[in-house]
């Protein structure tokens, strides 16, 4: 870690031109944060990102309990079911890349949100209908993950787009 810190500090040149560099003084940082926080598009993208992440982490924190303890999935098989979530995320990312050739980022974002909401809603409907089996959890969550894979890159890029000289603060 120390070697990497030295390499980064002294071996990688600063890519930003001097006239665009931001000061690390507290007043300058606070001014940047205030500017960023007042931007409605930044707030929208950030809230969208936060909501998608909250759905993701809700699943991550409860999935082992639901699948193993409630639905009886053997612990050695849990990883296989979990791989479906990873596959869904990858499919979403690859779909976003392909759609990026003909759609603007916000159009991809909306499509991803529709897919994610559909997955979450389907899981809720199945649970309320007392459909309790592994696939009633895995398939809707995989659908949610496809949407997540489409949404997250768009929200991050959108949040940073208006602040090219303050990307470190905005991220």
How would you name each of these model-derived features?
Residues 75-83, 171:
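Small-residue hotspots at the loop-to-helix junctions and early N-terminal turns
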Residues 107-155:
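C-terminal transmembrane helical hairpin of 12-TM major facilitator-type secondary transporters
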Residues 38-58, 142-146:
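Pair of pore-lining "gating" transmembrane helices in MFS-fold secondary transporters
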Residues 157-168:
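Paired intracellular helix-loop junctions of major facilitator superfamily
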Residues 61-77:
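Short amphipathic helix-loop junctions that connect adjacent transmembrane helices
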Residues 91-107:
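Helix-to-loop junctions at the C-terminal end of transmembrane segments
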Residues 1-12, 16, 80:
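Helix-loop-helix hairpin linking two adjacent transmembrane segments in secondary transporters
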Residues 13-46:
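Juxtamembrane intracellular "pre-TM" segments in multi-pass secondary transporters
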């Amino acid at each position: 870690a120390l070697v990497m810190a030295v390499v980064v500090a002294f071996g990688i040149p600063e890519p930003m031109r001097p006239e665009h560099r931001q000061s690390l003084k507290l007043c300058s940082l606070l001014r940047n944060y205030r500017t960023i926080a007042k931007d409605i598009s930044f707030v929208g993208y950030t809230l969208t990102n936060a909501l998608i992440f909250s759905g993701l982490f809700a699943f991550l924190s409860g999935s082992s309990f639901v699948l193993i303890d409630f639905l009886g999935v053997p612990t050695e098989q849990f990883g296989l079911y979990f791989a479906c979530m990873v596959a869904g995320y990858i499919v979403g990312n690859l779909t976003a890349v392909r759609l990026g050739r003909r759609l603007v980022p916000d159009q991809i974002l909306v499509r991803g949100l529709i897919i994610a909401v559909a997955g979450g809603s389907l899981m809720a409907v199945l649970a309320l209908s007392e459909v309790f089996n592994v696939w009633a959890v895995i398939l809707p969550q995989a659908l949610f993950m496809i949407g997540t894979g489409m949404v997250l890159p768009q929200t991050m890029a959108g949040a940073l787009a208006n602040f090219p000289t303050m990307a470190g603060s905005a991220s």
